[in-house]
Amino acid sequence: MPIDCKAKCGNRATLKRPKTGDALCKACFFAAFEAEIHHTIISSKLFRRGEKVAVAASGGKDSTVLAHVLKLLNERHDYGLDLVLLSIDEGITGYRDDSLETVKQNRDDYQMPLKILSYEELYGWTMDRIVAQIGRSNNCTFCGVFRRQALDRGAKLLGVDSIATGHNADDIAETVLMNILRGDTARLRRCTDIRTGGSEDSIPRVKPLKYSYEKEIVMYAHYKKLVYFSTECVFAPNAYRGHARAFLKDLEKVRPSVIMDIIYSGEQLRFKDTVKKPVRGICERCSFVSSQQPCKACVLLEGLNRGLPKLGIGKKSKGDRMIAKQNQELALRERANIVKNDF
């Protein structure tokens, strides 16, 4: 039996919003989706008039929808932003080379300037070569570290005021779970921030899609007939994030609001003053922002160039260090008991 659109526009509902459960027609869904992102931008004061903003473009659904909606809202609400596309070529054959064609299509569709930077030109390595040397166990560590710095380098070259990334609500909830499972309190609170960076030496990053569900982003792209690249990275199946994603999907079946619940929990976390927080400074080698000396990118790159790819990998988690400490204390007590019994 046909259902009327809950927005009472007079049309029949054609879809059900995963986020709210509301039955809506396509036009009302588009309006609600765009209005929520506009509210996020305005309420969080993500941009200021006259700013130049780089949209981190991968060709995937998130960055494509982000570019489309930012262009739309910029014109509709007169944000006064100068939007450009910034894409990173990691050098993954059969994945990034194909997705970059989609990015170029986005450039033409949205009439935005596009800058592409590659790992090859920045670091002298491609991910294909890195994986050939290190295997697939830690490839996402290398790629993630290099990609984050590559975006900073590209943003600096373009002279932008901020970088808009396509991180959605699912991504942020997954990251909260990952940091909890790793015992990473330093990153636990920061991962839910809608705006990061922004010191004198770093370009801020903003997440306009922070409260947008992945399912709704897919629906929006589908019904808007946006061109995007949907193939998963060939190295992604080995990523730790995949386990957090699968766990989150299972939880969502039982509790549909779990994504927003986890994000809210992450936002409300407060740590004791005794919890050590990383201090961000400038890497003495590459001059980019880092919380260690030298920065993680420089350490990993040095390992690759010296033929020691695991040089910057292998740091034990806090849980591992706690277990090691307990085992050490237990061994000391056992040794003390042996000495005591000998006398």
From Swiss-Prot:
Keyword Cytoplasm: yes
GO BP of this protein: protein urmylation; tRNA thio-modification; tRNA wobble position uridine thiolation; tRNA wobble uridine modification
Keyword Protease: no
Pathway participation: tRNA modification; 5-methoxycarbonylmethyl-2-thiouridine-tRNA biosynthesis
UniProt-listed InterPro entries: CTU1-like_ATP-bd, CTU1_C, Ncs6/Tuc1/Ctu1, Rossmann-like_a/b/a_fold, TilS/TtcA_N, tRNA_thiolation_TtcA_Ctu1, UPF0021_CS
Coiled coil segments of this chain: none
SUPFAM superfamilies: Adenine nucleotide alpha hydrolases-like (SSF52402)
Major site of localization recorded for this protein: cytoplasm
Pfam families, alphabetized: ATP_bind_3, zn-ribbon_14
Keywords: Cytoplasm, RNA-binding, Transferase, tRNA processing, tRNA-binding
Recorded family membership: Belongs to the TtcA family. CTU1/NCS6/ATPBD3 subfamily.
Protein name: Cytoplasmic tRNA 2-thiolation protein 1
Species the sequence originates in: Drosophila virilis
Lineage: Eukaryota, Metazoa, Ecdysozoa, Arthropoda, Hexapoda
